[in-house]
Amino acid sequence: METQKEIVFIAVESEDGGYIEKTERYSIFTQGDTWEELLEMIKDAVKCHFDEGAPKYVHARFVKDVTIAV
């Protein structure tokens, strides 16, 4: 099995508090109450998803939508 070098996760703030993270390329979703907890949960989710061929790097990007009145 070919090893992926990296996966990009997109994080958003949860309506219930904390963060939700997902990746579009794989069916991997996770969440955490704090940013630090989220990063640990991402590592755990990636390890659980891949039996072998896990990526060497994970990029976590935080996206925040803001509406500004002009």
Swiss-Prot record:
Family note: Belongs to the UPF0150 family.
InterPro entries according to UniProt: TTHA1013/TTHA0281-like (IPR035069)
Organism domain of life: Bacteria
Name the UniProt record assigns to this protein: UPF0150 protein TM_1311
Species annotation: Thermotoga maritima (strain ATCC 43589 / DSM 3109 / JCM 10099 / NBRC 100826 / MSB8)
Gene3D superfamilies registered for this protein in UniProt: 3.30.160.250
